[in-house]
Amino acid sequence: PELNTQFHATAHLNPLAMKTTTGDGKEVIERFRYSNDAVSSPLYGYKRIYNNDSTMTACSYSGQKPLIASTWNDKLQAYEDRLCHTYDSYGNVSSVTTDGRTYTCYLWSYCNQYPIAKIVNVTYDALLSALGKDKAWVEQLGNMTSPDTEMETINSLRQKLPEAQVYTYT
C-alpha cells in the first residue's frame, strides 16, 4: 500500500487528508477537520471514502471535552448520535452512552484524580437513587484523599442493582 498525506493547516501539524492506494489499485481517502480549523464551530469531523462509499463522523465539543459523537446515516440523511458524554465539575467523565439506552457511569476520588468505580448498564440518576445519595456526596467522594470508608457503600451496588456490572478500583 502507498500512503500520501496532505498537510495544509497553519494552526496545527495534524493531517488534513490521507490517501492510501491498496494493493489492488483502489484508493481509500480519509479527510479530517479539527476544532482548531473553525474556531466558531466546536465540531470535529472525519470522512472516509472507499469505492464510492463514505463514512462520516462528527463530534461536538464543549471546550476540550467531547460531548456527542455522531455518524452520518445515508438512509435518514442525518447524523445519528453514537456516543454521548457528561462530565463532573473537574472535567472527569461521569457517564457515557453509546446508544441512548446503555449507560456507563464513573465515580472518582483521590482528589478527583482517579476513577474508583465503573458501573455499566445504569443511568447516573438511578445509581445515586440506589445508593440513597445525591450529587453533593459525589463531590465529597471526589475530594477524598482515600475513599476507603465509602467503598462498602459502592460495593453495595452489586446487590442493589443486579442488572448492572460494577467494577471497583483501589
Task: Set out the residue ranges of the language-model regions.
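Non-catalytic interaction/targeting regions
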Residues: 1-126, 130-170
